[in-house]
Amino acid sequence: MRAVVWLMEGTWEACVDAAAGLGLTDVRLVHVLDEDTEAGWEGGPLGLMGRGRRRPDDRPGGGRTGNPLDEAGSGLLAAAAARLGGRPGGAGDPGAGPEVLQLHGRTETAVLDACAGADLLICARDGVRTERGPHSLSKVTRYVVDHAPCAVLLVWPEEVPAGVDLPPAPRT
């Protein structure tokens, strides 16, 4: 069974633990740097024009080398691979741990594209964590859950809220 584990800051540990608990051997760890977050990060230094400093990307060749967002994502993927019991690997790297993908763009599109050919998507609730119900999912997670081309395992990032009354069942 091929599983995709969608990693987000603050919830990734629960997703990796769920994958480990299922004993999955064919795992793809996915982290997405959202285009809006990247645009905000890259646009920030423009507000400092005329301050006499060069941006790191102004060197010849430019590129994303040294981007703190990329570095944080790579660190998250490495930590997740280690927690799963292996070193980061890839599809063509036999003997390595899980395949790791650091993607860029719209989060929902990138995650759904990464699910191509997968049998299972493991993701975590990332909305309101103090209550059960539809608000426990963000809009992006709700979209991914609704449109995933495979089965979805939705996990709580921490203990399930206790003592919360469930809404009445819908009338039929």
Question: What label would you give each PLM region?
Answer:
Residues A14-A19, A110-A114, V140:
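A short acidic, amphipathic alpha-helical/loop segment
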Residues Y143-P157:
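Short, acidic/small-residue loops that bind anionic groups at enzyme active sites
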Residues W6-G10, A124-D126, W156-E158:
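Structural motif
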Residues R28-V30, E99-L103, L153-V155:
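General small-molecule cofactor/ligand-binding pocket signal
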